[in-house]
């Protein structure tokens, strides 16, 4: 149950069309066949060992810039300041995987295969819906680290849906005390089930544009999270406090429905 007396609304929608690369801000997004947002994490990079090439494994990926057409029909890849003069190139999205594979292979100096999935490549295959965080939660993170902007916090945590008009960690209300006790809620016309607090990976401590590690990030964040647990948070779900945002599940009945910036969040 969403219990706090607030008026939550969808403030931002961010797609990450290529897993681990830059996001694109959109005003509306459709629920895709896998329960995530259409075009979110639709491309993933694979090395010859069949593993993802992503920010968790390869810090150099942070050096790549991706800029998308307004309708996400094309992506322009570049590496500003690269001494090897990797060319800036534009690829049709999501169809031009072969040419993009060659570009990434040249950059990483190893064989890279770009794969496309209309269902996306989520980290959590069970709670594969959009991740939800509040603007206030991201601002709370910024306040811990002098000089960090809210846009930088967005890039570090890479969530898809951002809610305004609520206090920090309000999104903790969107999962229950038990793993199987999903919390049902709606954003606009789309029905969701809140699943669990999202455990964070090695990516948030890294500068999203250089990959440089901010030492102490995880401890500072976790200590703050532990000492600032709201009374609505199901704390039993925190085996550790390096968690931010809520993972969701979206039923196949919601496929094709649209989310719009400004949509209300309802219990």
Model-derived regions, located:
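Metal-cofactor-dependent catalytic cores
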Residues: 1-267
């Amino acid at each position: 149950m969403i219990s706090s007396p607030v008026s939550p609304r969808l403030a931002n929608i961010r797609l990450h069309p290529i897993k681990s690369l830059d996001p694109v801000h959109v005003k509306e997004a459709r629920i895709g066949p896998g329960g995530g947002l259409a075009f979110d994490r639709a491309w993933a990079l694979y090395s010859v060992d069949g593993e993802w090439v992503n920010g968790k494994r390869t810090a150099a990926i942070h050096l790549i810039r991706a800029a998308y057409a307004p309708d996400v029909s094309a992506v322009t890849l570049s590496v500003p300041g690269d001494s090897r003069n990797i060319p800036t190139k534009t690829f049709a999205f999501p169809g031009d995987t072969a040419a993009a594979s060659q570009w990434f292979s040249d950059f990483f100096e190893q064989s890279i295969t770009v794969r496309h999935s209309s269902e996306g490549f989520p980290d959590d295959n069970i709670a594969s819906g959009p991740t939800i965080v509040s603007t206030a939660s991201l601002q709370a993170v910024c306040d811990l680290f002098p000089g960090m902007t809210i846009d930088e916090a967005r890039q570090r945590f890479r969530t898809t849906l951002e809610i305004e008009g609520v206090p920090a960690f309000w999104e903790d209300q969107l999962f229950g005390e038990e793993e199987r006790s999903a919390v049902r809620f709606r954003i606009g016309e789309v029905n969701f089930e809140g699943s669990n607090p999202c455990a964070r990976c090695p990516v948030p401590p890294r500068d999203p544009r250089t990959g440089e590690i901010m030492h102490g990030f995880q401890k500072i964040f976790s200590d703050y999270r532990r000492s600032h647990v709201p009374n609505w948070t199901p704390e039993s779900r925190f085996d550790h406090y390096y968690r931010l945002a809520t993972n969701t599940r979206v039923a196949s009945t919601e496929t094709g429905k649209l989310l719009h910036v400004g949509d209300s969040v309802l219990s």
